[in-house]
């Protein structure tokens, strides 16, 4: 079982495949997704990787978390998430996961927090049909109707579908398809919609109901701590090489060389 990644939802876009079919995709960005700590069987009772993503100012980070990040030699992160893995899929602390951790065509499960819509009635929140338009019904056309039974049990059961806060829940969308991967810019394009608003973090992991592709990297695609990103490496290669400085001989030495000739 491999680790997942933490990505930031940038928004949606549209592309066209080779057949000219319109493909709506969600653009997800990996922003400094690093391994912060290990969870081991001996110490914690389970095996997992703690990942961090995004950046956070040290002054806005608690003292305990500052020490936690310093122990792993990573910068303070805005988001911390644990992914359970098998022992052979552990990755060194400080390593940064890259977008080619997933391969095009792979199925993934994505977890995020849905858009909050405030207080909503039962018809909007639970798709209730409402009461009749006539035949004695007045004012209560959009109400949910009865909430209980009679004297026995004499109460409303917990979990009854009623009006209340709508949205802002943790939701996992299963079996989304990875359409394209841009490892150089750290982007993952996924077919369809992903829960959450733009700018929020989501968790991406291998689909639990689909087989892992044979070409998926194990234990994952990552670069070591301190290694340059593809953009930085390309910039270094494109930079012009420094020409060696040409030093002129002093005038006295040039005159002596002319006299000897």
Curated annotation (Swiss-Prot):
Record-linked Gene3D superfamilies: 3.30.160.810, Translation factors (2.40.30.10)
One GO MF term on file is: structural constituent of ribosome
What's the PTM story here? Methylated by PrmB.
Q: Which Pfam families match?
A: Ribosomal_L3
Any keyword Repressor? no
Using the record's annotations, give every residue carrying the modification N5-methylglutamine. 151
Region span, Disordered: 138-163, 214-261
Report biased composition (Low complexity) as residue ranges.
Answer: 138-148, 227-261
Q: Which InterPro entries match?
A: Ribosomal_uL3, Ribosomal_uL3_bac/org-type, Ribosomal_uL3_CS, Transl_B-barrel_sf
**GO biological process: one example:** translation
Entry GO CC: cytosolic large ribosomal subunit
Keywords associated with the record: Methylation, Ribonucleoprotein, Ribosomal protein, RNA-binding, rRNA-binding
Highest taxon, organism lineage: Bacteria
Subunit architecture:
Part of the 50S ribosomal subunit. Forms a cluster with proteins L14 and L19.
Family, similarity comment:
Belongs to the universal ribosomal protein uL3 family.
- NCBIfam families, per database record: L3_bact (TIGR03625)
- Any idea what job this protein has? One of the primary rRNA binding proteins, it binds directly near the 3'-end of the 23S rRNA, where it nucleates assembly of the 50S subunit.
According to UniProt, the name of this protein is: Large ribosomal subunit protein uL3
- Which species is this record about? Phenylobacterium zucineum (strain HLK1)
